[in-house]
A protein has these predicted regions:
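Surface loop/turn motifs at the tips and blade-to-blade linkers of beta-strand repeat domains
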Residues: 6-12, 51-62, 155-161, 199-203, ...
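Repeated scaffold domains used in trafficking and secretory/extracellular systems
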Residues: 13-18, 59-70, 161-169, 204-213, ...
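Residue-level detector of Asp-centered blade-edge/turn motifs that repeat once per structural unit
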Residues: 21-23, 72-75, 170-173, 212-215, ...
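Conserved beta-propeller blade signature
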Residues: 26-29, 78-79, 175-178, 218-220, ...
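Short loop/turn segments immediately following the C-termini of beta-strands
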Residues: 31-32, 83-85, 181, 223-225, ...
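Structural motif
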Residues: 34-39, 87-97, 137-141, 184-188, ...
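Short, conserved, GDST-rich strand-edge loop motifs in beta-rich repeat architectures
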Residues: 83-137, 223-225
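Blade-level signature of beta-propeller repeat domains, shared across WD40, Kelch, NHL, RCC1
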Residues: 352-391
Length: 391
């Protein structure tokens, strides 16, 4: 497997948590400081930084992010959902949290990227003793970024204290759908008018991101506390009602991995087929929105997580799966049974942890954005370097 690695040239960037391609530019949504957007130029192989599109982040002392919250519009602009770097309890990440989740030795890669003196408190508060939620975390914004002018304009604000933990963009119909941290609310946005509608709390967190079916319906999941099962969540933008369906996905959503539980990632293939991967056990499913039924296709990797899926020109699905070290997995939908799934190995076996969060595929190359290692790295896999697999 031939892989190139490029790092984002910004001191405060520590992860790539969203990605979208427009032409020959790949836009990288970051976890970092006030410059939360970087651009990879495919033709030159260079990553550059966009302007300071979130200047209000710079003064507070901890990261913001675009987390599964980026979508391209027909005119080439980007819709972005702002998030704050919060724990699942809705509190800012602190040095104590980092010591638990990311040992200080993991700062070594960031230091090697040209920032030799970085410390935990470049990216987080030492503790919460001086934190003021109303002043420092008043709530996020939905932004529209215009690459030709390198500026961002506000589309709308989220309700007080809430941030976009995900944001799906329906560019065809001019709408966006998201969920929040804290409190896991569902919301939708009319992008033409900037009107945001908050539909209230969903449940305990049950997905890393949602999916848009070809007909514009948005699907996710919710956890029923009565029996602990994970069930289908559905929002029809024409009906304008959030439905907590009784359709069972899993009787047990499984353990939390890196704080996530339930559904991890979705892909809508070119032919309209919808695939879904789960956090626990890295399970791959096919979802039929007509019947709202899930079919188990197999297990992708050890350790859990399915954090990205991309379809190539031949209909092969390339998947990032496994934790704490992501493997690249090849899935051929035309083959029935376990032989459809091939583990192509770890993304970068020389690292202690290489954990992928965002991706896109273009002209035979897979672009993978790394997270949870203090390294905002873009790993580029030449898929032609991977031996063809025959049934």
């Amino acid at each position: 497997m031939q892989i190139q690695e490029h790092s984002v040239p910004d001191r405060l960037a520590i992860a790539i948590t969203s990605m979208a391609r427009v032409g020959e530019k790949i836009y990288l949504g970051l976890t970092g400081g006030s410059r939360l957007l970087a651009i990879y130029d495919i033709s030159t192989g260079v990553i550059s930084m966009a302007s300071e599109i979130c200047p209000w982040i710079g003064a507070r002392g901890y990261c913001g992010k675009f987390h599964n919250a980026m979508g391209a519009m027909p005119d080439g602009s980007l819709i972005l959902g702002e998030c704050s770097h919060l724990t699942w309890e809705g509190l800012p990440v602190t040095a104590n949290y980092f010591r638990t989740e990311l040992p200080e030795r993991m700062l070594a890669r960031k230091r090697e990227q040209g920032f030799p003196d970085v410390t935990y408190t470049d990216f987080c508060l030492p503790d919460l003793s001086l934190w003021d939620r109303r002043k420092m975390d008043p709530g996020g914004r939905v932004l529209r970024y215009f690459p030709d002018r390198d500026i961002a304009e506000e589309v709308c604000s989220l309700p007080p204290f809430l941030y976009s933990q995900s944001l799906l963009v329906d560019s065809q119909r001019g709408r966006a759908f998201g969920h929040t941290i804290p409190d896991n609310h569902f919301f939708d946005v009319d992008l033409a008018t900037g009107k945001l509608t908050d539909h209230g709390r969903i449940s305990d967190y049950a997905f890393h991101q949602m999916v848009l079916a070809p007909d514009g319906t948005c699907y996710g999941a919710w956890i029923d506390r009565a029996d602990g099962a994970m069930k289908l969540l559905k929002f029809d933008p024409e009906e304008r009602r959030l439905r907590h369906s009784s359709r069972l996905i899993l009787r047990d959503p499984g353990s939390k991995i890196a704080g996530n539980q339930g559904i991890d990632h979705w892909l809508v293939a070119r032919d309209g087929t919808i695939f879904m991967g789960t956090v626990a056990n890295s399970l791959l499913w096919r979802f039929d929105p007509t019947t709202e039924e899930f079919t188990l296709l197999g297990r992708l990797a050890e350790g859990g997580r399915v954090t990205s899926m991309d379809e190539d020109e031949e209909g092969i699905i390339w998947i990032s799966a496994g934790y704490p070290h992501t493997h690249l997995v090849r899935f051929d939908p035309s083959i029935e049974g376990p032989q459809a799934i091939t583990d192509c190995g770890p993304i970068n076996p020389n690292l202690e942890r290489c954990y992928i969060h965002a991706s896109c595929l273009h002209k035979g190359k897979l672009y993978l954005g790394e997270t949870d290692g203090f390294s905002p790295s873009l790993h580029i896999v030449d898929l032609s370097s991977i031996s063809k697999v025959t049934p």
